[in-house]
Amino acid sequence: MRVYQFCRPFQLFTCFLCYLLVFVKANKEKISQKNYQVCAGMYSKEDWKGKIDPFISFNLKKISGLSDESDPGLVVAIYDFQDFEHLGVQLPDEEMYYICDDYAIDIGICEEENRDEFIVQDVVYDPYTSTNRSLANPIMTFSQNEVGLHDTRYPIKETGFYCVTAFRSSTSTKFNAVVNFRNAYGQLAGTEINKLPLYGLLAVAYVVAMALYSFAFWKHKHELLPLQKYLLAFFVFLTAETIFVWAYYDLKNEKGDTAGIKVYMVFLSILTAGKVTFSFFLLLIIALGYGIVYPKLNKTLMRRCQMYGALTYAICIGFLIQSYLTDMEAPSPLILITLIPMALALIIFYYMIIRSMTKTVIYLKEQRQIVKLNMYKKLLYIIYASFLSVLAGSIVSSFIYVGMNTIDMIEKNWRSRFFVTDFWPTLVYFIVFVTIAFLWRPTDTSYMLAASQQLPTDPENVADFDLGDLQSFDDQDDASIITGERGIDEDDLNLNFTDDEEGHDNVNNHSQGHGPVSPSPTK
């Protein structure tokens, strides 16, 4: 019994739209009787230089259930996506007939020499442009019923989005095949090759930014805040992580999707989980006033932040491991076991950051700590701007394709899709982190700002504070304030996520006398 001979006009196109969500991210892709179509972006040798001529090959790994020796097994078509409308012929009853068999030959819609191949029309009517349309590139079609690599490769002469479709001749036939989308430059898929130079440039940018921050760190090494040490350590981590990402794409382009590359990918995912988790953790302790509003956080509160960060990190790792163990061709709802907790953990993290940041800003405003208040306002603006930037990237990309018809959009989307979904958020993250690090960088005054009380803006209270207070710290006083070893009342730093434990009400509104400032929470 022949199958897939008839099909409604929109069904084949619907399949392509579905596959846009999971199109090839490597140069080789498996297809079977369940997933019989796959597409990938391909570059011509003129557009992206390389050692070989780009091609698409079809390798049948397994086939069973053939009805007899004359059974053609599989009927395969390799073509440019924009030519998909040229496949098949519409019958008088408006059904589409795709395969050239006895029936198709009898009614005259194909020739005997094209038996057991896809029916291809050289000119078709394009409903999107309301014009007749010719083939943009040749369509290669053949049948195969034996295991092995097909002896003819499909050459890529023009950059485009190419597809492979394999129809089985009977419902009992089962098969597995591998399609190799081989570009001239190496093993990377066309959708990923642009990441190689971009992540290389990003790694260089991280190195330069880290060097500048490290210079400021070294220059003021005797006037450092614990927060600035956190920032430098995270700078080193982010720089190394970006270099590892660039190295991953470079190795994958040279070696292909090997077992070692898969292990490397898992390693990168673990680093990414650490990047996300520590970013939230760092923002949380900054939002709580660590290093600027308070010399240090209460040990219990800091331990809670660290434990929650570790829990979130473990959940992210669990999700990534499960996602790698899950068959993407047959996704399971069991992935929700780790996906939902991860989403909830990050949402809670975000809520705590915004809530703590808002309370800190209100507190600084009430205490009229203008310099510190401006720092935290800038941080809030940076956070909001980052969200708007990511959102703007998606909106702009959507508007770019609004004026295109569906085929043109698909033909061009694969080249730039990675930038919106992958690299643009990474670039925004880099800009945000560097901006925050610059805002909290070591300076001649940053240490004194964190360990001193600011002159009140209320004229009635000016006499309560003297600028000589800032100059009364000796080295021992400075160390005691930062380490918390001198005169710290546990209640003064008893910060928590509740209103009563936030710690803002425990701060002295004015300094008393002209001695060293008490190591209670500073303003």
UniProtKB/Swiss-Prot annotation:
Location(s), subcellular: Golgi apparatus membrane; Early endosome membrane
The entry's keywords: Endosome, Glycoprotein, Golgi apparatus, Membrane, Phosphoprotein, Signal, Transmembrane, Transmembrane helix
Keyword presence, Electron transport: no
Lumenal side: 27-197, 252-265, 326-333, 403-417
GO cellular component, one term: membrane
Chain positions found as Phosphothreonine: 483, 498
Keyword Glycosyltransferase annotated: no
Transmembrane segments: 198-218, 231-251, 266-286, 305-325, 334-354, 382-402, 418-438
Compositionally biased intervals (Acidic residues): 488-503
Residue numbers of Phosphoserine PTMs: 480
Record topology, Cytoplasmic segments: 219-230, 287-304, 355-381, 439-523
InterPro entries xrefs: GOST_TM, GPR107/GPR108-like, PTM1-like_N
Family: Belongs to the LU7TM family.
Protein name stated in the entry: Membrane protein PTM1
UniProt source species: Saccharomyces cerevisiae (strain ATCC 204508 / S288c)
